[in-house]
Amino acid sequence: MRKVIFSGLLLLCVCAATASARGRVGAGYLVGGTTRWDAMGKQSYISHGPLVYARWSVDLSYYLDLDFGAEWRHQFMPFPSGRIHPVSGLPAGEIFNEEYITVPLNLNFIISTADMGALRFLDYVGVYAGPRLDWCIFSHNGSDRTFSFIKQDYGYRPLNLVAGLGIYVIKGKWSFTLTADHGFLDRCAKDDVKIKNDWFVSFRIGFEFGR
């Protein structure tokens, strides 16, 4: 499965690099974490690690560009006994491993920092928003006091709206992003589409290369 994912990311980079002289292609490796609030106001924390992605940006104007990409991420969440996993509905366990394939489409409003004096070391600060489609592959490895289990589920999230702040330090090097993600519909590990009202706030730091 991972070979397929990485092959797809590589193909995306190749296609994007040859598609348009006005476009930019990049790929990167990120780590970070997410704090989640569900519809009932309950909070949980998820660690990301790693997230590998590729993206293609097309300049629409001096201040706007359009990002299309794909990413694969692995995340794990320590989960205490006596509770139910918020996505799968499985009994409580210790560690839940989850794989995601994501296709984001973001519209970025770019603020160039080339002439900002003390901020000259930054490439740009950007605010972005757009829809995102997630394919979810869950591998739950956990146990409680009575039994152990390993379970896999497949699903997708048909609609997520994402907004965030990106700070790119020294072009083509390090990037820092802060995102707020509101999931409306959820079909991950479920047979039918559920109406969701979950908020996710993520911080990511990583390395990106490209042109």
Model-derived regions, located:
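Gram-negative (and chloroplast) outer-membrane scaffold detector with strong preference
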Residues: 55-142, 201, 209-211
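Ser/Thr- (and often Asn-) enriched beta-sheet segments in non-cytosolic proteins
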Residues: 20, 24-26, 57, 65, ...
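Predominantly the C-terminal beta-signal and adjacent terminal strand-loop region
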Residues: 69-80, 152-211
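Flexible, solvent-exposed loop segments that connect beta-strands
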Residues: 34-45, 74-99, 135-157, 186-199
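Short glycine/proline- and aromatic-enriched beta-strand/turn motifs that initiate or cap beta-hairpins
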Residues: 19-58, 208-211
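Cleavable N-terminal export/targeting peptides
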Residues: 1-24, 210-211
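Transmembrane beta-strands of outer-membrane beta-barrel proteins
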Residues: 24-32, 69-71, 128-132, 177-181, ...
